[in-house]
Amino acid sequence: MTAGPAAQAGAETEDLLLAALALALGGRTGEPLLYVELEGHGRTPPDGLPEPARTIGWFTARHPAWFDLTGVPEAAAVAAVRAQRLSIPNRGADYGALRHLGPDHARDALAAGRRPAVSLNWLGQLAGIEHAPFRLVSWRPGCPLRGAERAADLPQQHALAVETMLIDGCLRIEFIYDAARFDAATIDTLAADYAAALLRLARERAAPPAPPPDSPGELDADDLAALAASR
């Protein structure tokens, strides 16, 4: 997952996961658009905010996001997703504050928006969690001591929730779905499509178009091309 276009474009694992999800869902819906709620641990602070290194736990941040792969070849999907993800201010960390604590007009506008039917959560690297100081909490997928994560009568927030994590070097993907809308066979097929898309993207060697730089500069693609030509 760190080779091919993902590495060449400087993409993060989340970009690869998102691009593959867009391709897998698009292959079934025929739509090149992915409207998804992204969830993060919130421990990557926006610019200007303190580092959370001396704190414990997650500061869960959720926000909706659109990704458009219209006219984008598959080999460039990761770079396209990355470029669009980087355009989200502060990694979406401000959304929750505006949605629930912002001025009335901001809360009303965000509350009126359509919530994504799909969510993606990249939990990151969980290797060695059984040896961590908090191992007695038994927070590990598949652990029999883990217990229920949500009340049985709590409404499903998304029609499809995709939970992804890396455990001891192995990528684990969990599909949590609304059984009233999907049957197991449909989800099994989607999971296979998703895995196939991930493998294709991870193995792809064709260099995609360069994404925007990780800098606060206001340079577009034409400006960058002009600078490169002047050297």
Language-model features: where?
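The DNA-recognition helices of helix-turn-helix-type DNA-binding domains
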Residues: L23-A24, N90, R205
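Extended, hydrophobic beta-loop-alpha segments that form or line the acyl/peptidyl-thioester binding
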Residues: P32-E39, E74, G96, A151-P216
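Short, charged, surface-exposed hinge/linker loops at domain edges
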Residues: A207-R231
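Generic marker of residues within folded, mature protein domains
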Residues: G26, A53, L110, A152-L154, ...
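A non-catalytic, amphipathic alpha-helix used as a structural packing/dimerization or gating element
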Residues: A20, A80, T189-D193
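His-Asp-centered acyl/peptidyl-transfer active-site segments
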Residues: G4-L18, R28-G147, A179-A180
